[in-house]
């Protein structure tokens, strides 16, 4: 079973390999020349950016200091809305609970939104080992699932993959893809992924997603994409 694991002891070896990887350098070079400047531009267009960031930090610190209270409040509100909250003490308990829910519906296919907790507990491999096919629907997660890799970043799971590598991955995995069809730009790659994933959404028996925020007042979950 593949789970995220600490790799600090392998840093020197991994760093040497990464510095010699020209495709990785290309992928990260695009990040440096596009994503970072775009973030700076967006922040500059929001005069209250620093104040909002400070407010978010203070809220996070407060919530972490009272997490037991807010989790119980969240559970209460979820139950009032007819939902269920399952408490799991460790990764194995969480995996077994997910499997129990899937088996209750005789699920054969599960579509997944991005969930770092799912990565941490190795839910994809666990489901596959138990006869349930997990299908990632976040584009970055879908790409690395096809490549059988782990995420390179919590926000951009496939930041380390170039467009050329994505094209090669799709041509290998999508066996019905026309060999003459161009997949040279981001728009065509996204269209190909969208066409495949739309059908998987419709076929799925169960859906799994993470959450960026849990709202204790209402029992709601918030996903930022």
Residue positions per predicted region:
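The feature marks the mature, well-folded catalytic cores of soluble enzymes
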Residues: 1-225
């Amino acid at each position: 079973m593949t789970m995220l694991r600490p790799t600090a002891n392998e840093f020197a070896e991994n760093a040497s390999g990464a510095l010699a990887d020209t495709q990785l350098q290309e992928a990260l070079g695009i990040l440096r020349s596009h994503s970072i400047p775009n973030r700076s531009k967006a922040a500059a267009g929001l005069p209250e950016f620093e104040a909002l960031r400070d407010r978010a930090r203070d809220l996070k610190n407060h919530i972490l200091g009272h997490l037991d209270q807010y989790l119980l409040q969240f559970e209460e509100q979820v139950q009032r809305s007819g939902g269920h909250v399952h408490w799991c003490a460790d990764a194995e308990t969480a995996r077994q609970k997910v499997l129990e829910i899937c088996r209750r519906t005789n699920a054969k296919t599960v579509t997944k939104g991005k969930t770092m907790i799912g990565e941490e507990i190795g839910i994809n491999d666990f489901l596959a080992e138990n006869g349930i096919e997990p299908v990632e629907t976040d584009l970055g997660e879908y790409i690395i699932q096809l490549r059988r890799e782990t995420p390179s970043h919590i926000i951009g799971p496939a930041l380390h993959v170039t467009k050329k590598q994505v094209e090669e991955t799709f041509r290998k995995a999508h066996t019905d893809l026309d060999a003459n069809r161009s997949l040279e730009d981001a728009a065509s790659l996204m269209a190909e992924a969208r066409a495949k994933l739309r059908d998987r959404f419709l076929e799925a028996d169960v859906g799994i997603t993470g959450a960026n925020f849990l709202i204790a007042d209402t029992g709601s979950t918030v996903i930022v994409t």
